[in-house]
Curated annotation (Swiss-Prot):
Region (Required for homodimerization, interaction with PEX11G, and peroxisomal localization): 220-239
GO molecular function term, any single one: protein homodimerization activity
Name by which UniProt lists this protein: Peroxisomal membrane protein 11A
Topological region Cytoplasmic: 1-83, 240-247
Function: May be involved in peroxisomal proliferation and may regulate peroxisomes division. May mediate binding of coatomer proteins to the peroxisomal membrane. Promotes membrane protrusion and elongation on the peroxisomal surface.
Alphabetic keyword roster: Membrane, Peroxisome, Peroxisome biogenesis, Transmembrane, Transmembrane helix
Transmembrane segments: 84-105, 220-239
Compartments (UniProt record): Peroxisome membrane
Provenance organism: Homo sapiens
Post-translational modification: Seems not to be N-glycosylated.
GO cellular component, one term: peroxisomal membrane
Sections of the chain in a coiled coil: none
Amino acid sequence: MDAFTRFTNQTQGRDRLFRATQYTCMLLRYLLEPKAGKEKVVMKLKKLESSVSTGRKWFRLGNVVHAIQATEQSIHATDLVPRLCLTLANLNRVIYFICDTILWVRSVGLTSGINKEKWRTRAAHHYYYSLLLSLVRDLYEISLQMKRVTCDRAKKEKSASQDPLWFSVAEEETEWLQSFLLLLFRSLKQHPPLLLDTVKNLCDILNPLDQLGIYKSNPGIIGLGGLVSSIAGMITVAYPQMKLKTR
């Protein structure tokens, strides 16, 4: 209960909750649209999705501040690769929120001289770059974690006077792939924050990929990805120890 209270008291927590609701509506709407007699339910879900999306706009200032703070923190990272990737990713995220704010200003009628499609495409590009850079950082962290697991395993097998598993694997492609996937599984299992961050970024990137026409998805896939990403984000907000730390 304390974790939930702390979660809802944070701007990031409320935004994740609204976001999860929005993508749940999108997913349910996609599943129910082909079914006869569900028109009213689909319409209600569409209205709720729109209302929640509009409500999330009020968290914009908090998101911008959070992105700026994240940029300042990433600059001081000791490792070059995370420092470079996270700084550029957070800068792109700040620009994305600025573009999103400009779109919001147009949508509420404060100005009419804004090209909606142009700014929407700009926002999607910067969001895509932010997620792509975050995934590069995740891949780098995964490679380091896999090296640690390999070394630890080799030490244990050496102390037990056994031949290391990694040197006994046959060179056939299928066995190599199995060994790699097993190592990847063990690496992520031992580092839950890295697993959460990777899953979150992979799910999030589906949306800009679709908007930019790089890889088309249906609303069901985007809704499911957004829901999974939101749940992962909610976990990191409620339990800060599950957030991937910057070294």
